[in-house]
Amino acid sequence: MTISEVAQGFTSADADDDRWVDPRLIRAAAGAAARGTVLLTNDGVLPLAPQTRVAVFGRVQIDWFAVGYGSGGDVNAPYTTNLLDSLVEAGVAVDAELARTYRDWCAAQAVPTPQWGDWPRFHPEMELDDETVDAAATRAEIAVVVIGRAAGEDRENVLEPGSYYLTETERRLLEQ
């Protein structure tokens, strides 16, 4: 199956009523994502050893940017996943207490469904106190910080915090 075939023939035109996705589409999309992923540096951390204890920080671990923006990107995806659920599904020993903190906060601070052309470039980050970060650090061997951005037609990146630059909350999280 080629990407062209995927784009033209294996999705439903009526996505609100028909959520079926051809399994070949799922495999092709996963393969394209793997080929499009670039790891800049590794320093021996990846792949994670089985049962490595991982603290995952950042709301985008849950509130994932699953699609792009604009005419070709603002779609009703038949399903989505997020990094936290995918790590757990893969058997990574994520810090359950920190994950629960993020799940609860994200549920209380739900990302609104935007109108066309009014998409967010980022999702506001949760402020964490030093005690929460320190406690997670004592339970985990590795920390993963997830920061997300989105852009597309009618919502290009700009040279400001929350787009190309980190917000102050993101910067503080990285410094903790």
Q: What spans do the regions from the language model cover?
A:
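C-terminal non-catalytic regions of proteins with extracellular/luminal or membrane-system context
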Residues: 1-176
